[in-house]
Structures are given as C-alpha cells and as structure tokens.
UniProtKB/Swiss-Prot annotation:
Pathway membership: One-carbon metabolism; methanogenesis from acetate
Any one GO molecular-function label of the UniProt entry: anaerobic carbon-monoxide dehydrogenase activity
Stretches assigned to coiled coil: none
Name of the protein described by the UniProt record: Acetyl-CoA decarbonylase/synthase complex subunit epsilon 2
Family indicated by similarity: Belongs to the CdhB family.
Gene: cdhB2
Physiological role: Part of a complex that catalyzes the reversible cleavage of acetyl-CoA, allowing growth on acetate as sole source of carbon and energy. The alpha-epsilon subcomponent functions as a carbon monoxide dehydrogenase. The precise role of the epsilon subunit is unclear; it may have a stabilizing role within the alpha(2)epsilon(2) component and/or be involved in electron transfer to FAD during a potential FAD-mediated CO oxidation.
Keywords: Methanogenesis
A Pfam family hit: CO_dh
NCBIfam families referenced in this protein's UniProt entry, alphabetically: cdhB
GO biological process entries: methanogenesis, from acetate
Length: 170
C-alpha cells in the first residue's frame, strides 16, 4: 500500500488553511460519495500512464471530465464525457452557485484534480477554496496546499501505484 500522506511540506505562514493529506482509501471513498463530481485534468495527463488511469477513473464512476490546457486531444475516442474549458475560467465558474455546469445540470460539489502544474492549480484553487463550497481532491503527484484534500509529494512510481489503488477501490 502506498503511503500518500507523506511529504506534505507546508510553505505557508501562520493561520493559513491548507489541505489535508489523504490516503488512497479516503480519496476513493470521497470520489464515490460525491453527488456531482467533476474530474479536472491538465496537460500533464497526456503522459500515457496518467491518461490510461484518468480514463479508468472517469469510467469507473461515470465522472465528466473538464479537460484544461492542451489535454483534450488525449480523450478523443476514449469513450468518456470530456469537454474543454480554460482552467482559470473554470475556477471562476465554480465559485458561482448558479453556474449550470458543463452539462447544464448545475454546479459541482466535488472536483478531482490530476495533471496540473502545482503553481498554476494552487492559484485557481485559492479562489475555489475561499469563495465556494466545492470540495477539491488532488490526486496529483505533488501536494496541492489549496485543495481541500491532497496526496503528498510522491515519486512517479508511487503516484502511479496510488492511482491504481484508487481505481481498484472505486
């Protein structure tokens, strides 16, 4: 079993709310219990190992995918519900409780994050964390401090193993 709670280095000042380190079991349970999840993927998901696992996660619970950056081509012909959206715009929309969502059925209660640059996604999640009730679960390689919950900093091999554990638990 991969310890996904290790190496959560906090580079923040006193009083700042940061994400909780989570295990693969907790991540899978939260994803399974989400009423309106959205899988937000970045360009890093084009790595073949990550892309394969992203597709498996989306298919396991029929989770729609918000493909950001240049990640959309990876989901063509993969039989998943993927739509392109700009990451910054998505962050703005998620803070609006009246946003109809990518499918017109309302805003999301939980976002799952994979394949993003740490410095970029942290800025977007700062707004989501402070101005909405949307929970964010980062299953990325790096600890994302502005997510609600996040894996710790993992090696590539540990990250792939952790994603496989999440898939098995979904």
């Amino acid at each position: 079993m991969v310890d996904t709670t290790k190496n959560t280095k906090l580079f923040t000042s006193y009083g700042v709310k940061t994400s909780k380190a989570i295990t693969t079991e907790v991540a899978a349970k939260l994803i399974s219990k989400a009423k309106r999840p959205l899988f937000v993927v970045g360009t890093g998901v084009l790595d073949p190992e990550l892309l394969d696992r992203a597709v498996k996660i989306a298919k396991a619970k029929n989770i729609p995918i918000a493909a950001t950056g240049s990640s959309m081509p990876g989901f063509v012909d993969k039989d998943v519900n993927a739509k392109y959206i700009n990451l910054h715009q998505l962050g703005f929309y998620l803070t609006d409780p009246d946003w109809p969502g990518l499918d017109g059925n309302g805003n999301y209660d939980t976002i799952i994050l994979l394949g993003h640059k740490k410095y970029y996604i942290n800025q977007v999640l700062s707004a989501v964390k402070n101005f909405s009730d949307v929970k964010s679960i980062s299953i990325d390689r790096n600890y994302i401090q502005n997510a609600t919950m996040s894996f710790g900093n993992l090696s590539k091999a540990d990250h792939i193993a952790a994603l496989d554990e999440v898939i098995d638990l979904l």
